[in-house]
Amino acid sequence: MRILGIDPGLRTTGFGVLEKHGNKLAYVASGTIRSNGETSLPERLKTLYDGISEVARTYAPDCAAIEKVFVNVNPQSTLLLGQARGAAICGLVGQGLPVFEYTALQLKVAVVGYGRANKEQVQEMVMRLLSLSGRPSSDAADALGVAICHANGGDTLGTLAGLAPELARKGMRVRRGRLVG
């Protein structure tokens, strides 16, 4: 199975492609799609849409996994990120791909084993898990990480509801839309 992972962003969207053969993961490609901050928002969204569509056509994945939007302190940033994510999802669905969604917590637990891992830890573990010769950019590492999350059975944890029984056993609960322990 070939999986395309996406880390959405308005300035920089990361992508990562990997193959899953049984329990083995193999790196195929990764990179970033950048939009020009000098252009209008609709033009930037079109750049992301076109870039994602091209990546999907080039690497012909069987499915896509994308990171869910987190709620930022700045509502304007959250709205812009949501629009970039929407453009990415449209590009994926436009290529006929099923799209699976994962939170940053799910990604970090799948890759590092710790939900509060920092970007450097995610980069390092992605490099090790996929036997890469160099460290990928943080955007590409997150995209590869979300693909790894999906490859390792993340599709059964696609929603917070899928995680709820395990989290409850660990003393965690949802409060005001956030996970607390």
From Swiss-Prot:
The RuvA-RuvB-RuvC complex processes Holliday junction (HJ) DNA during genetic recombination and DNA repair. Endonuclease that resolves HJ intermediates. Cleaves cruciform DNA by making single-stranded nicks across the HJ at symmetrical positions within the homologous arms, yielding a 5'-phosphate and a 3'-hydroxyl group; requires a central core of homology in the junction. The consensus cleavage sequence is 5'-(A/T)TT(C/G)-3'. Cleavage occurs on the 3'-side of the TT dinucleotide at the point of strand exchange. GO terms for cellular component: cytoplasm; Holliday junction resolvase complex. InterPro entries: RNaseH-like_sf (IPR012337), RNaseH_sf (IPR036397), X-over_junc_endoDNase_Mg_BS (IPR020563), X-over_junc_endoDNase_RuvC (IPR002176). The lineage of its organism: Bacteria, Pseudomonadati, Pseudomonadota, Betaproteobacteria, Burkholderiales. Its EC number is 3.1.21.10. GO terms for biological process: DNA recombination; DNA repair. The gene is ruvC. Belongs to the RuvC family. The active site is at 7, 67, 139. It is found in: Cytoplasm. Keywords: Cytoplasm, DNA damage, DNA recombination, DNA repair, DNA-binding, Endonuclease, Hydrolase, Magnesium, Metal-binding, Nuclease. The keyword Transferase does not apply. Homodimer which binds Holliday junction (HJ) DNA. The HJ becomes 2-fold symmetrical on binding to RuvC with unstacked arms; it has a different conformation from HJ DNA in complex with RuvA. In the full resolvosome a probable DNA-RuvA(4)-RuvB(12)-RuvC(2) complex forms which resolves the HJ. It catalyses: Endonucleolytic cleavage at a junction such as a reciprocal single-stranded crossover between two homologous DNA duplexes (Holliday junction). It comes from Cupriavidus metallidurans (strain ATCC 43123 / DSM 2839 / NBRC 102507 / CH34). SUPFAM superfamilies: Ribonuclease H-like. Mg(2+) 1 binds at residues 7, 139. This is Crossover junction endodeoxyribonuclease RuvC. Mg(2+) 2 binds at residue 67.
